[in-house]
């Protein structure tokens, strides 16, 4: 936990007045709450909490988990749904119920299910609640069904074009947004040829942002993919 908090503190110091959303999720509520409180004390502006993984809580358990943290920590909270990694989907009814909490400000959608994402966007229209893409290849489709932005991997490598694509889509200029989506498509695919964050760390090293070191059990990107990234 100490190292986790040091990373949050280092980012806040490095970016000065840019808002920082700290990832503070865990597979148990007590640990997620502690990380969230410490991130708040460090000066984070908001929290991103992946749903509890591996232990597969019921939907009522997910509601209790997120509400407990939202009640205790006075920061906006983004719920993060990525069932391919956690083993449990946050269902639309659950997301809608969570959206009614004043401190739960958004939902990062990485389920790959556009029908579900669109339903959540539709049913939270009257809430102050952002539905954000968590999958670069689905950012444009997500906005088309009511999403309001993205938390992007590709933006670490192509921030300008990613922002331009999102901005064009939100402005209703889908011709320009599609053009940028197709330009970025090869990068979207390359960044997921192996488990995230392996490819993006390699790409950032290529761009000069430091070594692509990994902690076990993650490994460096396979040689066969490095050339394509370059």
Language-model regions, residue ranges each:
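C-terminal alpha-helical cap/extension of soluble enzyme domains
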Residues: 21, 147, 154-230
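Generic secondary-structure boundary/loop-capping signal
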Residues: 51, 79, 87, 111, ...
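Active-site beta->alpha loop and helix N-cap motifs at the rims of alpha/beta catalytic domains
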Residues: 1-87
